Amino acid sequence: MIIPLQMSLIPLLKLMKGGAILFGVTIIPELSLNGTFVAVWFAHTGFGLPLATFLLRDFMMSLPKSVVESAKIDGASHLTTFFKLVLPLSVAGIAAFATFQFLWVYNDFLVANVFMGIKPENLVVTSHVAQLTVGNYGEEWHLRTSGAVISMIVPLIVFFSLQRYFVRGLIGGSVKG
């Protein structure tokens, strides 16, 4: 969360393309992930983990301790307590994080272009919308505008389907005063 995303893209691109060698010793072997969706998934997972940790930790800390303590008294293990009590009670926080992460990944232009390149078969939705502007007679803004409106349909469906959890998930981990 401290280092800006843009500063870490080139080192990550070098890592995905050729691995990591330090003083002649191969630390991470050549991954050859450049130009694949796996590289974009790794990047988005790595950049999304701090937000997930921040949001879900605060949300889970706001859950009532008496519920967890009663599960321990009943003889539930840590895994049983987590999967049968904490996780179902955290659905609102998980849905809020899932909404944030989906909207960030879906609307991402920079990370996808850096790791995927400009091959037509590897372009994501935002890259396709950006390429709609150049025509034979100049820029065709009506194509870009209509492409942007059409590309907003999927995020709107996701947001409206998770909307009831969204506010509860954000408020659930906040400080009560």
Locate each region found by the language model.
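A hydrophobic, multi-pass inner-membrane permease signature
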Residues: 1-177
